[in-house]
Amino acid sequence: MAVGGTGSQERVDPLVANRHWWNSTVPVHVASDFYDVAGWLAEGRGPRAREAAVLGDVGGLDLVHLQCHFGKDTLGWARAGARVCGLDFSDAAIAAAQDLARRAGVADRAEFVCAPVVDAVALLGAARFDVVYVSLGALWWLPSVTERAAQVGGLLRPGGRLFLHDVHPLSLALDDDDLTIAYTYFAQATPYRDSRVGSYADPAAIEALPGDPTFGWNHGIAETVTALLDVGMRLDRLDEHDWTSSARYPWLVETGEEEFVIPEGHHRIPLSFTLLATRV
């Protein structure tokens, strides 16, 4: 995760640095076994079964995916019958998403917009969507869950739903090498600085990715939930999971497709969580 402190962050805009890193990951991720774009295209896969079980039938609904990266998950919902819009601050990711939509044959019901989350309502329109979808690894990259919640509430029609699945903030407080607490669970104004090389999708892609740092902010569960309640959302369910979808720590053990857990012999803690909320 992070290496503590922020070093020379005063001379670096964290969001600019993050955008630079995400732009550089796009070709690596599109080609990676982790994302398996070729298999996804060939097999016509839709959304993950566990996510579809929570959201149910999305046929004919308007769905927006915030921080969509290169759009693979977004387009899975298009294959399930939704009209989708993906938003991401990486122009390289948006270009790749538009190309993937064409290759998947769903470009007629998929729109992709390059913009930061804080501009979502202004650019996409208020009360336009039935579903806001946010998937793993999103909350960390924005300093304010309050601003994000305002965008979520503004994008949804009355009765519209937020689906959020993300890394559990407790797991983000763990040391990279063991199960000790190394970082704060609660939000702080100063971001963490992460100077690791490679990527979660391809840790060996050292030469293809810059060694420049990225920056992130941890957000406790209560902070995230309260921000949503404050903008008129109703919390429908909150589930904590003892698994996560990627091997973000070297000591995790793979037990199934996109499922990694703490090894036997250690106490279990939540590694990810799922939240469903409704705009009232």
Label each PLM-derived region with a short phrase.
Residues D130-T146:
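A short SAM/SAH-binding and catalytic strip from SAM-dependent methyltransferases
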Residues D33-D62:
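Conserved alpha-helix/loop element of class I SAM-dependent methyltransferases that forms part
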Residues R161-P203:
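Conserved class I S-adenosyl-L-methionine
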Residues V118, A122-V132:
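A short acidic, Gly/Pro-enriched loop at the edge of an enzyme's catalytic core
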Residues T146-R161:
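A short glycine-rich, Lys/Arg-flanked "PGG" loop and its adjoining helix->strand segment in the class I
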Residues T214-L238:
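Short alpha-helix
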Residues M1-V37:
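N-terminal, positively charged/glycine-rich alpha-helical extensions of SAM-dependent methyltransferases
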Residues L61-V121:
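Class I SAM-dependent methyltransferase SAM/SAH-binding core
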